[in-house]
């Protein structure tokens, strides 16, 4: 009852005040499309930071007596609940862990910096503290300069400069727990002034907050709400940016149908978590604390759950037998086919799940997928509006230093254009109207994947005639809108991409100290388009970079219906966990459950011979893997990976390899590695069972090495290191090799075949050129011989007549 009363009081106190609307602050540094991960919390006691006497003055938040009393009552009740239940947890995050790439620096043109973070919906904040350190310019006037700290537009405190001591901190600010919502924004707003007249854009006036400043949050768990409609909660909360851990409980470590059902669930969770990443530890019993997902036939469920009455495919949420705050999701049925149906009920019917804690799932027909139709991939048969990729608000900027506007997009990486013809980016953007900024020095810079493409002035300065015509109402229409078409080189487009638009604004020179406008808006038109329609789907394999960036070639069909996973006959929990993590990676890549993938043991590979194969194995089962890698240049024996024997034609064949790959062809002695001690290998080659199909083998001495390899594959920071046909992972160190012959996946029209054959192969051009020369010489020799023979006959005939 005390807990219920506490919750009711907190809900009442929170409801009495409208949820604050967070202001939109620019990120401290444009850091790609990945949002900042929220790390695992460090549980420790909160310790106040004492401010020394020579540090800048701080101002504590003030509130009216009534609201302060209400807040104190809420906090007192929360503290009593903590003491009674002893379940309070203190989470300590540095600003760097919340997403700050470096110190949050503010100056004249960039006065606002902010960070976003989330509070899980099943947690209640009872107290919080912000501990800040940093520095402020000694040129600032203490009376009229300050950094104001707010949380969701609610005042927390103020930092004021001390010219004699530029650095400050650590300074501690208590935060009212009522200020917290599920999605929070912590803002630092800078107001500056100095003696005399100072141009705010010259960098003399500044303030910075260290990325090592800390936010301490104390939370208690709320009573669980077991409603299927809340999925993926409580297993995943979209407001929390940390990597997600979702335990799975399987009665049997290897059962193809149950593993297929589990893979569908893992890919759905991967689809929900997207960039955050997710891992699925596998257990045979329910964890003592927290949440878990149990998958299996009803008769084989853990005994701790009791006997569950099941009449068909069933989804059910029950309490963790060992933890009343934990929730166990049951995905079950009377047989294995019903378990698969139940998993599809989540994968394809999550939007229709009821508010109840139990549901009987009807059979679901999801239909067949077609190639390259993954929901996360942009179409390549038409121009795509930027407004289809991001909301309109993501294309709007404000002020002199608005930060980069990011438009992430994904595409199948096997794109090819005739003679490397570029793609088209049609950009429409709107500049501030009137004499607000110096348009001759202001521009829109456009890039892709951190590579500069083009810069356009915001607007050409008006001529004298234009100014006169504008004043009398005869000017050129809306010339604040510009339209440009720019090329995008095909080699700059990968599986995961990010278009960047940066408005570089220059202030107008004002006489004296007259301030110019500080609030104005720019935007990229949502009707701007990116056009990849001049491309074809064809590429040369193996290429592990395609796997790392887009799961290619397995994600050619979003449901992996042309792919199969090969596991050992008796995999342990770590191997199964690696399989689930890989399916989560596929779901995050395509945004679609892997309902079409088959799971087989090594004894049944021939049943899926016509599919692309993903093999996960340890050294104990490496004999089966060696047969599937017979078309590669690598062999596995006695726990070691080494280069296999190559024919005398290998050197000649290497002349016809792709020189633009960035990976050098290796000699037979270049690869010699043991796969023990945490070392793992990822090998890609053509399948010996079907021409044009791919085998991807993930190998290690134990299941832990396999699991680490999958986690490395899913981390975007490692994508540039994963290339070629072999990657060796020694912890976080990756080494790439290329040695195996290339093969072609995909087709092009007949008229493009010659260009494709010569593409990036100067050796082939030379050979074809030589053959052409030989052919021309042969034709000329034959023609000259015929001419000489005819001339000889003519001479003989003339002699006979004379």
From Swiss-Prot:
Residues 786-802 are cytoplasmic. It is a single-pass type I membrane protein. It is found in: Cell inner membrane. InterPro entries: Cell_synth_B, Cell_synthase_bac. The keyword 4Fe-4S does not apply. Residues 19-764 are periplasmic. Binds the cellulose synthase activator, bis-(3'-5') cyclic diguanylic acid (c-di-GMP). This is Cyclic di-GMP-binding protein. The lineage of its organism: Bacteria, Pseudomonadati, Pseudomonadota, Alphaproteobacteria, Acetobacterales.
């Amino acid at each position: 009852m005390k807990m219920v009363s506490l919750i009711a009081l907190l809900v009442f106190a929170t409801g009495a005040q409208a949820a604050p609307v967070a202001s939109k602050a620019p990120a401290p540094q444009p850091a790609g499309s990945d949002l900042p991960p929220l790390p695992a919390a460090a549980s420790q006691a909160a310790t106040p930071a004492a401010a020394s006497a020579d540090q800048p003055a701080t101002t504590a938040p003030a509130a009216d007596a009534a609201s302060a009393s209400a807040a104190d009552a809420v906090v007192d009740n929360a503290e009593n609940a903590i003491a009674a239940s002893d379940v309070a947890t203190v989470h300590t995050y540095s600003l760097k862990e919340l997403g700050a790439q470096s110190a949050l620096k503010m100056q004249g043109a960039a006065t606002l910096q902010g960070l976003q973070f989330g509070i899980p919906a099943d947690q209640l904040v009872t107290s919080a503290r912000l501990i800040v350190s940093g520095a402020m310019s000694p040129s600032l006037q203490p009376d009229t300069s300050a950094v104001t700290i707010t949380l969701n537009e609610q005042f927390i405190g103020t930092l004021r400069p001390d010219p004699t001591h530029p650095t400050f901190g650590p300074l501690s600010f208590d935060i009212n727990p009522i200020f917290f919502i599920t999605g929070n924004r912590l803002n630092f707003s800078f107001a500056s002034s100095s003696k005399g007249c100072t141009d705010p854009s010259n960098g003399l006036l500044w303030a910075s907050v260290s990325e090592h400043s800390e936010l301490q949050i104390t939370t208690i768990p709320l009573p669980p709400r077991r409603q299927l409609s809340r999925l993926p909660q409580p297993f995943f909360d979209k407001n929390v940016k940390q990597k997600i851990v979702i335990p799975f409980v399987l009665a049997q470590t290897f059962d193809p149908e149950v593993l297929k059902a589990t893979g569908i669930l893992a890919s759905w969770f991967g689809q929900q978590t997207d960039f955050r990443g997710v891992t699925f530890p596998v257990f045979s019993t329910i964890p003592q604390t927290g949440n878990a997902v149990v998958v299996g036939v009803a008769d084989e469920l853990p005994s701790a759950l009791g006997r569950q009455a099941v009449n068909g495919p069933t989804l059910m949420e029950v309490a963790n037998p060992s933890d009343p705050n934990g929730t166990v999701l049951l995905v079950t049925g009377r047989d294995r086919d019903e378990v698969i149906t139940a998993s599809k009920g989540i994968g394809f019917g999550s939007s229709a799940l009821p508010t109840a804690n139990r549901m009987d799932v009807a059979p679901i027909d999801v239909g067949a997928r077609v190639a390259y139709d993954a929901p996360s991939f942009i179409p390549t048969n038409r121009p795509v509006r930027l407004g289809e990729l991001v909301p309109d608000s993501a294309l709007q900027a404000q002020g002199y230093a608005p930060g980069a506007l990011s438009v992430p997009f994904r595409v199948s990486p096997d794109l090819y254009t005739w003679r490397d013809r570029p793609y088209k980016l049609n950009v429409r953007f709107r500049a501030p109207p009137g004499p607000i900024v110096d348009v001759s020095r202001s521009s829109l810079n456009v890039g892709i994947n951190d590579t500069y493409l083009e810069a356009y002035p915001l607007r050409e300065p008006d001529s004298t005639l234009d100014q006169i015509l504008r004043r009398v109402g005869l000017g050129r229409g809306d010339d604040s809108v510009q339209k440009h078409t720019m090329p995008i080189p095909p080699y700059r487009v990968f599986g995961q991409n990010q278009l960047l638009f940066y408005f570089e604004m220059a202030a107008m020179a004002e006489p004296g100290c007259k301030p110019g406008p500080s609030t104005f808006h720019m935007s990229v038109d949502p009707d701007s388009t990116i056009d990849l329609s001049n491309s074809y789907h064809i590429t040369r394999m193996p290429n592990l970079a395609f796997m790392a960036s887009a799961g290619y070639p397995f994600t050619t069909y979003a449901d992996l219906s042309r792919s199969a996973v090969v596991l050992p006959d008796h995999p342990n929990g770590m191997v199964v966990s690696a399989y689930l993590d890989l399916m989560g990676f596929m779901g995050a890549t395509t945004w679609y459950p892997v309902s079409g993938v088959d799971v087989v043991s090594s004894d049944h590979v021939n049943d899926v011979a016509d599919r692309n194969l993903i093999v996960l194995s340890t050294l104990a089962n490496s004999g089966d893997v060696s047969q599937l890698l017979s078309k590669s240049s690598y062999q596995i024996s006695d726990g070691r990976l080494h280069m296999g024997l190559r024919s005398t034609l290998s050197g000649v064949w290497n002349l016809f390899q792709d020189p633009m790959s960035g990976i050098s062809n290796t000699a037979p002695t270049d690869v010699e590695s043991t796969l023990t001690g945490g070392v793992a290998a990822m090998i890609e080659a053509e399948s010996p069972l079907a021409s044009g199909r791919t085998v991807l083998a993930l190998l290690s001495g134990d299941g832990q090495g396999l699991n680490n390899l999958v986690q490395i594959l899913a981390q975007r920071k490692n994508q540039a290191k994963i290339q070629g046909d072999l990657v060796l992972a020694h912890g976080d160190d990756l080494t790439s090799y290329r040695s195996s012959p290339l093969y072609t996946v995909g087709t092009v029209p007949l008229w493009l075949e010659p260009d494709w054959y010569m593409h990036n192969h100067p050796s082939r051009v030379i050979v074809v050129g030589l053959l052409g020369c030989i052919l021309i010489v042969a034709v000329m020799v034959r023609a000259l011989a015929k001419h000489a023979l005819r001339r000889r006959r003519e001479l003989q005939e003339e002699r006979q007549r004379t």
